[in-house]
Design a protein with these regions (language model features):
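N-terminal leader/domain-start detector
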Residues: 1-23
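Polar/charged alpha-helical tracts
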Residues: 5, 23, 67, 100-107
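Short alpha-helix boundary/capping and kink motifs at helix termini
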Residues: 17-71, 75-81, 88
């Protein structure tokens, strides 16, 4: 597991700026592998906002590496895993590189 402080905060804009190749996919939640060892706590209002975005399908896609290791979006993933009824697909941006390579790119 990787510490939250070692994982960069990513979105499509950052990926484009860093010229990191990615593609938009819909995948099953079970195909995603979380790699972050710790989470920042968040209050009920923050949880409700994220939950609402997930239910309305307006959430930012989760960011996964080439092997579906979750790089960004662990709180959203935690909420998605607790949904009842379960979600059958999740929006992701899949990178064409590994999470180790991503970490190295952002250390520079």
């Amino acid at each position: 597991m990787i510490s939250r402080s070692d994982l960069p905060q990513l979105n499509a804009t950052v990926l484009h700026e860093k010229r990191i190749p990615y593609e938009y996919l819909k995948v099953t939640p079970n195909s995603i592998k979380p790699i972050q060892s710790d989470r920042l706590p968040f209050d009920d209002n923050h949880y409700i906002r994220r939950y609402t975005k997930i239910v309305r399908d307006t959430y930012n896609p989760l960011i996964v590496d080439k092997d579906f290791n979750l790089i960004d979006g662990h709180h959203r993933y935690d909420i998605i895993r607790r949904m009842d009824p379960p979600m059958t697909s999740v929006r992701v941006l899949q990178l064409g590189i590994s999470y180790e390579t991503v970490i190295e790119l952002f250390k520079k």
